[in-house]
Regions:
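Non-catalytic terminal extensions that flank enzyme cores
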Residues: 1-14, 32, 37, 133-139, ...
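Active-site cores that bind ATP or allylic diphosphates and position pyrophosphate for catalysis
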Residues: 104-253, 261-266
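N-terminal Rossmann-like or analogous alpha/beta NTP/dinucleotide-binding catalytic cores
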Residues: 1-114, 205, 213-217, 221-234
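Short, surface-exposed acidic
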Residues: 69-71, 236-239, 273-275
């Protein structure tokens, strides 16, 4: 089977070894199968993404020896498609406005999830407000995020028991979606529209991605994405959640922790051949 895989970084900082490992894993799977490898820039959050980081990550990938099929897809150029999906979900009655502040969200989340941004946390926020309360907050110009109501989604789908995906990892098999672990997750914001979790399922479907290959830190997000795929009548790809690369301190590489970047390694004289060998891709 020819695989269609993708690497979808967010240009919010420079790439590190963890990114290189993930990109090489997806690229190798596609090339060994005679398939296609796609590069997608997940830059929906214009408040944090920077063009210089996109330029740098493309340079890093080329330095690693990676190539991709077709043009680079930038999510910032596809907001119409994502907002259409957001509108469909609103029309279904499965979204509600959440007016909690960033500080409140961070306190509830207890840490930073994907995107290093507490506004994406799935902690329970009390559900939708009454019409009177919501109208008052909107009249005051209070900022809000759109959250997916799991109760409403469950009612519309007749339950989550039938939602599953095929996992091809060290623990392969059919996995049942358990979206309750993340609660009512943020799927959009007033300032940027539809967020990562919607944009990714829309793009995976439109680009014909057969295998989503990414870090195991995102395995819980798959349950929410299965709910969205079911609501939006989108196909379900096969998933491979690979191990996370850990640094000398035993912690996973992360932008927010100042992990050594690929640019810094390159400037220090490390070659792409050496790094690929270190990561297991000799």
């Amino acid at each position: 089977m020819s695989l269609v895989t993708r690497f979808a970084p967010s240009p919010t900082g420079l790439l590190h070894r963890g990114h290189a490992f993930s990109a090489l894993t997806a690229w190798t799977a596609a090339r060994r199968s005679g398939g296609r490898f796609l590069l997608r820039i997940e830059d929906t959050d214009f408040t944090r993404c920077r063009p210089e980081y996109e330029t740098a990550l493309i340079e890093d990938l080329r330095w690693l020896g990676l190539d991709w099929d077709g043009p680079v897809v930038r999510q910032s150029e596809r907001r119409v498609a994502y907002d259409a999906a957001l509108d469909r979900l609103r029309d279904m009655g499965v979204l509600y406005r959440c007016f909690r502040t960033r500080k409140e969200l961070m306190a509830l989340a207890g840490g930073a999830p994907h995107g290093d941004d507490p506004v994406d946390a799935g902690a329970f926020t009390g559900g939708p407000l009454s019409a009177v309360e919501e109208a008052a907050l909107l009249a005051d110009g209070k900022p809000f995020a759109w959250r997916l109501s799991l109760n409403a989604a469950r009612d519309r789908l007749g339950g989550f028991e039938a939602l599953a995906w095929i996992e091809e990892t060290a623990d392969p098999g059919v996995k049942t979606a358990r979206p309750e672990a993340l609660g009512d997750m943020v799927v959009g914001r007033k300032d940027i529209g539809a967020g990562y979790v919607i944009a990714s399922v829309v793009d995976d479907a439109e680009q014909g991605v057969t295998h989503v290959i990414r870090g195991e830190d995102l395995i819980e997000t798959t349950s929410i994405q299965r709910v969205l795929q079911a609501l939006l009548d989108l196909p379900t790809p096969t998933y491979r959640h690979h191990r996370l690369l850990l640094g000398p301190d035993g912690k996973r590489y992360a932008k927010r922790d100042g992990s050594v970047t690929l640019m810094a390694l390159r400037e220090a004289g490390v070659t792409a051949v050496e790094l690929r060998a270190e990561l297991g891709f000799a």
